C-alpha cells in the first residue's frame, strides 16, 4: 500500500494495492455501481472461451471451466476483435483451441495480478470517475 499525503503531523493514509482507494474509505453506498465490461478468457481442458460480460462474477460462475485465465477491459467490440484475431483457432461458438498464441495473449493480459485484482482496479477507477 502506498502512503497518501495528509496534513502535517497526521499519520499518512494507506492506499489499497489492489483497488487504489484509501484503506477504510468506502464509496457512497447510494452511488450506482459503475458498469465495467470485460472480455474474459476461461480455460476448459484444451479449449478457451472468449466472452464478455458486465457482471463477470455471475457470468464466470455460470460457465463450466477449470481456470479463469484473464480479463481485459472491453465490451462486445473488443470481444468480436478477439474472435477475429483468433478465428483460426475457433472450435465452435466462443470456444477456441488453447494454442500457444492464445495462451500467451491471456498471460500478457493477466500480468501484474489476478483477473479479479485487475477487475477491482477497473471498478475502483470507474467509481473514482463518478465522484470526481
Language-model segments: what does each one mean?
Residues 1-132:
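Non-catalytic accessory segments flanking enzymatic or RNA/DNA-binding domains
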Amino acid at each position: 500500500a502506498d502512503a497518501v499525503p495528509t496534513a502535517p503531523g497526521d499519520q499518512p493514509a494507506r492506499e489499497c494495492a489492489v483497488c487504489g482507494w484509501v484503506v477504510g474509505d468506502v464509496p457512497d453506498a447510494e452511488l450506482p455501481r459503475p458498469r465495467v465490461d470485460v472480455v474474459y478468457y476461461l480455460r476448459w481442458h484444451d479449449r478457451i472461451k472468449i466472452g464478455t460480460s458486465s457482471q463477470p462474477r455471475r457470468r464466470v460462475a455460470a460457465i463450466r471451466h477449470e481456470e479463469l485465465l484473464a480479463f481485459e477491459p472491453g465490451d462486445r467490440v473488443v470481444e468480436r476483435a478477439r474472435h477475429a484475431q483468433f478465428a483460426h483457432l475457433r472450435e465452435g461458438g466462443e470456444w477456441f483451441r488453447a494454442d500457444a498464441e492464445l495462451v500467451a495473449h491471456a498471460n500478457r493480459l493477466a500480468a501484474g495480478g489476478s483477473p479479479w485484482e485487475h477487475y477491482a482496479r477497473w471498478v475502483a477507477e470507474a467509481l473514482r470517475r463518478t465522484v470526481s
